[in-house]
Amino acid sequence: MHKLLVIIAHIIVCAYADFTGFDNEAGAVENNNDNNINLEYKPPTLRHGAGISCVIRPGDFTHVAISNDFFNRANLPAGFVNVNLEVTDFASSARCKAQLESLAPDDTLTTLITGAANCEIDQGGVTMVVYLKKNPEEIYLKNWRCGYKGSGDYVYKTLALQKTIKGQWGDSTDADSPIHPPLITLAARVETSTETEITLTCQRNNRGVTTTYFTGAPFKTVEFTGAENFRAKGDLYGRDLTPSVVPQCVINTPGDPVFKFKNLGPEDYSSKCYSGFLSTTLPEIKPKFTLLRNPYDVDFNGYEPNDVTMDFDTDSLFLFDRNVNMDRVVIDKHPYMVMKFLKPRNFHETPLLNHVDPNQPKHTFMTSISFTMLNLLLGQQLHKATAIQTVEVIKNSGDSASITCPFDSSVEEYLAIFLLDTSTCSVSLSNRNDVVQYNNSCVDPTNFYLLSSRSTSNDQTFTIDLTGNEACISKYATCIYKKKVPGITNILLLPADFASRDKIPDLSDKDVEDTDNCEEDPGLIKTLERGIRLLTFSDSYSYDYHLDQYNVLTGDGCAQLINPCEYDTTASAMKELGRVASVRVPIRFLNKFPDKKIWQCSMYDTDSDKMSWNEMRDNVACSGTELYKSLITPPKPSVYRSDENNFKISCGIIHRSCINKGINTSAVLSGTEIEDTLLEEGEEFTISQYDLLIKNKVLKCETEWGVGESFISDLLPTNSGCSVSGSCVFIDMNTIRCFYDSKNCYSHNINNVKVVFRINDADVPGANVKLSETNRFEDGFFHFLYPVASIVSIPTKNTIGFKLVDEWQRETDEFTVPYPTVEQWAFILESGIECDYTELSSAVLDVSMGRYTGETTITLQYDMYNFPECKTNENETSVDYYLQIRGEIGTSRARREDEDKSMTEWKNLVYISVHDDGDGVVTWQPISNQRDYNLDIFDNKILAAFRYRLTQEKITELFGPYINSLEVRVITESLDKGVYEATKEYLDQTMAYRTLMIPRIPPQPPITTATTQPPIDVMITTQSPNKPTEDEKSLDLEMIGKIILLIAFVIVFVILLTIGIITLVKRHRETLPEDEYLLP
């Protein structure tokens, strides 16, 4: 197999070498590091388009080659460039160029190369440059290679052109300027948006650079993306390239100078406007347009609509989708549009009356002639509105033909234009009203014949005498309608320098150039062969809505072909601060779930920031000259906590620019269980936490221009800290009982949560349960019975547990968005273990503080239920639970890990007894004569667990205000299993000092004790809870020591004070005369 592949590869190489002119026995060796070859991409300049330069250093070689793909030639399109020169051909640049031109026909090679290539020769070396007419990406070039052949193998170097050019940004006129991508911004254009359509723009900013951007980057595309697969993409080839300096062919037109025009040459197409022509013809459709342009408005502003229409076949336009409705066509409502003739046409390619080519489209040539005639013949008559229609010349019986222009009551005069080939027919028509013979160095010899007639009440028919002329008359003609009501209707061909200027120039006499140089440059294309025409039209038409028809892209300078046969395109004026492309989108599409409409645009391989429609709509609605209420964003409800038990609701902020325009700022607040409440700007509505979380799912703010609504879960903080703890117990092998508690899950309603049971890591079918709607998620204790005898096999080790799933789904008429799932395994039970009660889990399940209630919650369980195989049904079991807490005393909220803790003595909270009659019936009973409102027993016949809620006031009452943390322990006394103790520490510095209600605590009964082996990882004790522990004894000794030390200090102080007083009195007496202190 290996030998076969080698043989095949050898055959391919030999065949390729023979095809390209290489020696059959010489291989091709790629050497990208060869110092004798330099291959590089040359960006466009003022003189040339983009180029590929191959420089071979002086040396001993016989052949030089440059190619755009050596090994894939068969797959390349027409116009493939493969140049292989011998050194002996380097006599002069002219001979080099001549040989390059001879390598391919002009009609293919010139589509890639402007004037073929240039060769330069120095001392034994050669420089070969291929200049491209099209941008490299447009002709889809993968790689370029250049190389030389000496006495041995052919050596070449490869340039991956697309990879090389991509990302080259900066100032093309300054080689030292920094290279960076442009800044791309997405915005909504206020001045061209309406209450039914919005214009989104994608703009490239100059970043302060005043010169043009790097001109060599071929990746010039713009793309708009939005929700629901909205996507509009188009090419921007050549818009930023330096304007050409090649002389243009200008027609000397008679009549008023304002109607003089000039066509675009090929250099203009490649450097400013358009870089190639379509090879396909669009299907024939007949939309109606209004021709309208103000000749004095050079900035493309201030157009006024009229009712003039233009009806012609639109194959000569590239504006339309293949699938548009024939009768209703959507066009961008800019005040102008661009026409382009799809293929080069002249008179000799136009079908004649007696020789009709079925593959030859009728309308391309005749539309071109029609526009030309409007400029050449009508002159100042264009002050009247004009409509144009292409019709067929019908041959009658005998030697005559007729042209029929349909009747129109508003038409004042009918004109008909047809053509006569004067190169083959010298006989003039005898019945023509007017003849204009037009022939100069820029066009082929052609005669245009104009027939005219005043208004009639029927279709206007012109008859043509065919005597001697049947073989010379065109098959198609053009009807031109002059309206009775004068209007401003000008038809203007796009000037050559439009793409580099902000304004349409005044095409006066000074713009008319000498046409003698037209034939000197073979690259120029003659008048009537190709051209881009600029027309204007009004918005006085109707259409059917179709989303694809709104993918209308507009760009700077000249209109570009945007995805042929798929998207519309028009032109737009250039902007001084950057380049702008735009797309129009219907408001009805945007207003449907506006918060889901996220837009972004891309230009020059750089993305803009993402923006939602809501971020742009208020600016469009309130910042322009018109106020569009339907576009204003309705205010949405907002919620914040006012205290521990209440929330405040308000209707959000209205855009300031809308308020400045006088919008009513009142809103009506409503909810699932909230009656309509009128709120003025800044006003709030108070609601309790329970009512908000339990009774309401959605809040709404209704204004005169719309309704803003939000789900409760969206208004509350996220559940990033939501955690669930809980336990499952086996009552027997047919029953599972579970409960859970949660932290920071306050934004959930219990009716949105379901429990999914799992055994051995698999969901149990049919075991899922919807939690009670009467409980909040925060207080979600529940029980569930499920037979597991058939699933759990003892003594095989199994696991059982459950997870909580938030299944809140928001239903809309568009789509369903599932709420983010909250999942956490609350408990995993291992069965099949030895019945060693030292392995029992702690009786203290959880100690936590409520996020809003501020209560410390202590949850306990009768954990012997967790191991049913260790419990016999014959034995009656009773266990007493003693719940105690103690606190760490401190003055700082920071935990002092490096210091010994100063703990208070243990305080009794609650004393509860649980009784199991041996048949699975469990009875809980608080040992108290007074009801404790802070004690919850969760179904004393089903679930072996209870919970105690401890307020901050109670903690302060027990220990004083300076408690940094709490420790909780439970001591159980069992008649048959003894006592064990479990301790769990609780720390929460931020919540420790909340003020809440003071609960009623019953008096605590005495606690007895018993002795047994305690479980692992718990605090060991053998004392009764009423007897002092070792910690308590240590605390008492410490206090006695402090008291003794204090007494000793006081005694010493009194002694020292007495001695001092005696000393002072003695010294005072010594200073007095003896008789002063003697007794009298």
Swiss-Prot record:
Glycosylated residues in this chain: N439, N664, N875
Keyword terms, alphabetized: Glycoprotein, Host membrane, Membrane, Signal, Transmembrane, Transmembrane helix
The UniProt record lists the keyword Protein biosynthesis: no
Source superkingdom: Viruses
Membrane topology classification: Single-pass type I membrane protein
Annotated transmembrane regions: 1043-1063
Annotated localization: Host membrane
Predominant place of localization: host cell
Extracellular side: 18-1042
Intervals, Cytoplasmic compartment: 1064-1080
Protein name: Uncharacterized protein ORF59
Classification of source organism: Viruses, Duplodnaviria, Heunggongvirae, Peploviricota, Herviviricetes
